[in-house]
Amino acid sequence: MKNIKTTVFGMGCFWGAEEVFRKINGVVSTEVGFMGGTIKNPTYGQVCRGKSGHIEVVKIDYDPEIISYDELLDLFWNNHNPTTPNKQGWDVGEQYSSYIFYFDDEQKLIAEKSLEKMQENTDLKIVTIIEKAGSFYPAEEYHQKYFMKKNNSILNF
């Protein structure tokens, strides 16, 4: 069996975040959902109303022999604005915050170095939070692979 690893990113609306990663060679699967927060199994409505403290995230299972964690981080940084707190584009709210959730010390170290490198290249403050992964709560089915199902060309990734 292959050595599949997992990472979770919060980078605004999870529909677009999933679309960034789902077609990448080496990504085995993606799933959108919620992390952080104060209640178990939150609904999309609870998260959007700001009542749960959760972040919209994309969970990515990947084969590190095909794509590295560094490469996934590059996609993360290049597909959202890590300098705007609680906001991505038109989407405003705590649930749209920039987060990297790590699963082990190696991911933590790589993520921290990656953030330092990003900060060196901008005068703006990077507000991305790096945090140990906790419980992942999948979003409702209609949110999964949203743009693929809708065949929506609004996003040009």
UniProtKB/Swiss-Prot annotation:
Keyword hit for Protease: no
Q: List the coiled-coil residues.
A: none
EC assignment:
1.8.4.11
Q: Give any GO molecular function from the UniProt entry.
A: peptide-methionine (S)-S-oxide reductase activity
Active site, UniProt feature: 13
TM ranges: none
Keywords for this protein: Oxidoreductase
Top-rank EC class of the record's enzyme: oxidoreductase
- Cite a single GO BP annotation: protein modification process
The record's section on InterPro entries has:
Met_Sox_Rdtase_MsrA_dom, Met_Sox_Rdtase_MsrA_sf
Pfam family for this entry, one? PMSR
Q: Can you state which reaction this protein catalyses?
A: L-methionyl-[protein] + [thioredoxin]-disulfide + H2O = L-methionyl-(S)-S-oxide-[protein] + [thioredoxin]-dithiol; [thioredoxin]-disulfide + L-methionine + H2O = L-methionine (S)-S-oxide + [thioredoxin]-dithiol
Functional summary from the UniProt entry: Has an important function as a repair enzyme for proteins that have been inactivated by oxidation. Catalyzes the reversible oxidation-reduction of methionine sulfoxide in proteins to methionine.
Q: Which family does it belong to?
A: Belongs to the MsrA Met sulfoxide reductase family.
Identification of the protein by name: Peptide methionine sulfoxide reductase MsrA
Q: Which organism is it from?
A: Methanococcus maripaludis (strain DSM 14266 / JCM 13030 / NBRC 101832 / S2 / LL)
